[in-house]
Amino acid sequence: MNNIIIKKRALTNRKLCSNSQYNWKKIFLTILCLFSILTLSAQETVICGQVTDANTGSPIVDAWVSVAANSNGIATNAQGYYKVSVHKLLKTSLTVRHIGYKTERKNIVLSDSVCVNIQLTPTENMLEGVTVTTRSEIRKLRESAMPISVIGQQQLQGTASNINDVLARTVGVTVRNTGGMGSASRISVRGLEGKRMGIYIDETPMSQLSNFVALNDIPTNMIERIEVYKGIVPYKFGGSALGGAVNVVTKEYPPVYLDFSYEIGSFNTHQISTVLKRTNHKSGLQFGMGGVVSFAKNNYKMALANLDGRVVERNHDSFKKIMGGISIKATKWWFDEMKWELILLRTKQEIQGIDLDIREAYNHSINYVTALTLKRKNFFLDGLDLDFDAGYVSGKYGLCDKAMHRYDWDGRVLPPVSPFGGEQNNFASDGDNRSNELIVKCNMGYTIDMHHALNLNIYADHNSLHPNDSLMDKSLGFRANFPSKMKTMTVGLSYDLTLFDGRFQNAFTLKEFLFSSHSRSIDIYSVKEPQPVKTSKNYIGFSNAMRYKFTNDLMLKASFNSEVRIPTSEELIGNGYSILASPALRPERTSGVNLGLLYRHIKADGGLIEIELNGFYNQLEDMIRFTPDMIPTMARYRNFGSVRTKGVELEAKGDICPLLYLYANGTYQDLRDVRKTIPGTEVENPTRNKRIPNVPYLLANFGAELHKENLFGGKGHNTRLL
C-alpha cells in the first residue's frame, strides 16, 4: 500500500515537474516574443531623397525636413539631399520648409527604406514689380570643394562701380585698366592673367567674343552674382582655362518686367540700359528684349615725356558701343526650358596718339550672334539631366587708318606713313576681316543616388578667319595674313562622391583636349610662297577637389589639378591686321595644388561672418606671351617657358550689424621664372629664379559699407555708402 502511495506521489511529482517545465517554456517564449516585438519596434526606417526647385530643378540647400512621428528634423546638404530615421510605423507624413518656398507635406507608406524626392514651389512677393525669391546658391558655391569667391547681389546692389572695380576688391584678384570706358583691361587671379582666365556669362564661354565684349560692358544692375574660380574651372563650363574663371550670372527677371537705367560719369561717360520682359502664362512663352548703349569721350590732359613734359589734351579716344538682343523662351514644351536668342554688337573706338596727334584712325567691329539653349530634367531616364547650348557668331572687324596727312602736337602737317596713307603704323590699313565661329556645349549629369553622380561634358568650337585688307598689302608690298581655320574639342567626364550626410564631398574630373589648325605662313627672310601649316594635337588633363565639414561652420578644402589650355583663335591664327598667325604654338600646361580652411557662420539676425585661409602652388609650362615680330608694327604669340607660382591668401568679412559690413583681405603671391636656358638655345637663362616683372607680389584690400533700406521712404530701396 505504501509502495502504491509512493508511486502515486512520484507520478504526481513528475507531472508537476513536467507542467512546471512547460510553464517556464511558455514564459520564456512569451518573454522572447515580447523582446522581439520591442526589438522590431525599435528598428528604424530610413527616409532619404532630394529637395529641388519646382521651376528650375536646382537643388535647394538648407531646406528643413521633418517627420510627423519625430520631433527632430534635418537640413538638406549642398546638393539638396536629406536622410532622416523614424521608428517603424505603417505610415507617416513628411514636411519640408524653406524661406521663399511654399511648405510641402507628403504622406508616406513606410518600409525598410523609402526614397522621397520633394519639389518646392517658390513664393513670389511682389514689391513694386520686383520678384523677391530667396535662394541659397551662394552658400552652395562657397561650401563646394573648389576654391571660389562669390560676389553676391547684396554687394552689387546700389553701387555705381563697374565689374572691374568690384573684382579688384576680391581676394587674390588684380585688375589692370589701360584707361576709361572702352580701354583694355586684364584680370589676374593669383598672378595668372589674360587669356589663361576663362570668361563666362551664364556658364557660356565668351570664346571669340571676348575680343569684342568686355565684362565692363555689362551693367551691374543686370547681374545676379559674380563667381571667381581659382585654379579649377567647373567641368560643366566646358572649354579650357588655367588660371581660373570668372562667371557672370545675369538676373532672371519676373514674368512681367520693365527696367530702364541711365548712368553718367567722368570724362563724358554715358551708359543707357533697358530690359523688357513679357510672359504668356497659358502657353509658357516668355518674350524678352534689352540693350546697352555706351559712350565715352575719354578726353583729358596729359603730360608728354617725349616733349619735356608738355601738357596736351587727349582728344581722339572716344568709344561707342551698342549691344541689343531679343529672346524667346518656352517652359511648357517637352523641354523644361527652350530658349532662342539673337544679339547684335557694334563698336567703334578711336585711337589716341602719344608721339603725334592722331586724328582719324579707329578700330571697328560688328558681330551677329544667335544662340539656342535646351534644358531637360530626367532626359529619357530618371536622374539624367540635359543642358545643351549652341551658338553661331558672324563678325566683321578691322583697323581703319588711311589718312593722307599726319599732325604733330603743334598742328604742323606731316606726310603719311606710306604713299597709301596712314597715321600710326608703318602701313596704311582699311580692314574688312570676316570671322565665323560655331560653338556647341552639351552637359549631361546623371544622379545615381544621394552619394554618387556622373557628368559628361562635351565642348566643341570651330573658328574660321578670312582677313581682307588690300590697302595694308599694298603698303607692305606683300600679303602678311591668310585665311585660316581652327577646331577644338574638350571632353570631360567627372564623378562626384558625397558621404557622411554631406560632410564629405569629392569631385574628380578627367579631360581630353583636342585641337587642329590649318593656315599659311610666310618666311620673312626669303621670297618663297606662303607655306601651308597644319597642326593636330591632343592632351590629357585631370583635376580633383575635396571638402570636409568638421562642423556646420568650419570646413577644409583641398584640390589638385593638371590642366591644359588650348590657344585661342587670336593666339593661333592671328587677327588679320596686327597679330600674325602662330601655327606652331603649343598649349599651356599647368599642375597645381590648393589647401584652404573656411569658417562661415550665419548669425541669428541673418548676418554673415566669413574667414578663409588658402595656400596654393602652381607650375606653368609653355607659357604663352605676346612678342614683337620682324614685320614692322606686327606681333605674334610665342611660348615663353616655365613659371612657378606659390602664395597664400587670407580674407575676413562680415556683417557687424544690419547697418555695417566690413571686409579685409590680403594676398602674397610669388611668381618666378624657372627656365634653365633661353628658349631655342643652350645659353643659361640670366633671369632664372627671378620674379616675373610687372606682377605684384603683395596685395591687400579693406573697406566698410553702410547699408540702409528705404532710407528715403518707399519700399524695396537699398542705399549703400562704400
Can you say where each PLM-predicted feature lies in the sequence?
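Periplasmic-side early beta-strands and strand-to-turn transitions of outer-membrane beta-barrels
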Residues: 255, 263, 280-359
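Membrane-embedded beta-barrel scaffold of Gram-negative outer-membrane proteins
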Residues: 549, 557-561, 588-646, 667, ...
